[in-house]
């Protein structure tokens, strides 16, 4: 932990949030047990990662209760402090959010990973209506909104625990406010309070089972197939090459959302595992796909397109992999999305600095395998994170190509707002690094109802029945996780 003198020196350099860090051994705990001890209340989060579908990432992140958060819907933003609105803004929320983020000047913590606090949460799909290059083409008609969640919700994370899964250590991070005369002392006291919480045992919420329920499609199979045929008509007319329609499923779910996260992380380990407690609703997900990642001046997108079910045996798994890589439709769709990714990254990157670093590799998850590629660029001077978001949002894999025309068709054919689905979840650090996953393989739990949404890439030779089945396959991990909870994880 830095000394009072070091703290004062950093304040003199103009930093208005200064991290105090305490390192402890926590090798007898897991990220889940630590979350139960330190957080497990509204406006907290747990972020984990599984690399390559088979090993946990080095770091996990627990956000302690956030006193400040922003909610944006349409052209209005509310800033909350301890549950009360303290600031409001009318107009495009994105410049306001960027200005809010930029209020905080913090020194880096060299011994820790790149994320050590900042804005954490999501940008829902309807964020598209705030980008000027989309707004003039999209109608933004009023649609049914069964979830009723904000378009954007971001927490200001100033107290967190960074878990090093390799060493078994936990780094407690509390940001002090040097504008407060006793800011340093208050942060030290808060660290001691958190240490006390760590020493205490926590009640383990057992999952003993509940009533079994079935998921019901909002769209319905036959209307969805008709939607696929309508999109194919647009494709044959030359309007577009691909569109990704989606359908939402819902089921009664009265169990703990944290139990759902336990089941999902076991069933479908993914690069982005996340649990967000927003009070009146929860987001639980295991997304395999980056929307965009910024690390200093490098930007990365990683398109995923092309899907097969996992095989029941290694031989069947290999056969499915070979079948996927020899499927002309899937390959053509994937190449189109690589080109779209190159175009998106190219808009914000220096000339000649865009490259495909992985091309059409197979990544395997619990229920499905995908074709994946990696596109990287070096940012032009002066690019902001909102410039990056504008260039890459929404993902081509969730919209289609050309992107704007595909989004117009989605607006026409889907019966309700997408909400969180198809948007982005993740972190925007104080250091301006950003890591956002696409909100897929993701459940929203609200009012004892679980919602999960999934899409299928429709091209000229798509079979409507196959595209319907693809939406079922992609939702399967979340629905099966919910059923595992209903059967009882701890029976």
Swiss-Prot record:
Its cofactor is Mg(2+). Mg(2+) binds at residues 333, 470. It is an enzyme of class 4 (lyase). Keywords: Amino-acid biosynthesis, Aromatic amino acid biosynthesis, Lyase, Magnesium, Metal-binding, Tryptophan biosynthesis. It catalyses: chorismate + L-glutamine = anthranilate + pyruvate + L-glutamate + H(+). Chorismate binds at residues 306-307, 421, 441, 455-457. InterPro entries: ADC_synthase (IPR005801), Anth_synth_I-like (IPR019999), Anth_synth_I_N (IPR006805), Anth_synth_I_PabB (IPR005256), Chorismate_C (IPR015890). Its EC number is 4.1.3.27. Feedback inhibited by tryptophan. It comes from the Bacteria. One of its GO terms (molecular function) is metal ion binding. Pfam families: Anth_synt_I_N, Chorismate_bind. GO terms for biological process: L-tryptophan biosynthetic process. L-tryptophan binds at residues 49, 271-273. Binds 1 Mg(2+) ion per subunit. Pathway: Amino-acid biosynthesis; L-tryptophan biosynthesis; L-tryptophan from chorismate: step 1/5. Heterotetramer consisting of two non-identical subunits: a beta subunit (TrpG) and a large alpha subunit (TrpE). Belongs to the anthranilate synthase component I family. Part of a heterotetrameric complex that catalyzes the two-step biosynthesis of anthranilate, an intermediate in the biosynthesis of L-tryptophan. In the first step, the glutamine-binding beta subunit (TrpG) of anthranilate synthase (AS) provides the glutamine amidotransferase activity which generates ammonia as a substrate that, along with chorismate, is used in the second step, catalyzed by the large alpha subunit of AS (TrpE) to produce anthranilate. In the absence of TrpG, TrpE can synthesize anthranilate directly from chorismate and high concentrations of ammonia. NCBIfam families: trpE_most. This is Anthranilate synthase component 1. The lineage of its organism: Bacteria, Pseudomonadati, Pseudomonadota, Betaproteobacteria, Neisseriales. The gene is trpE.
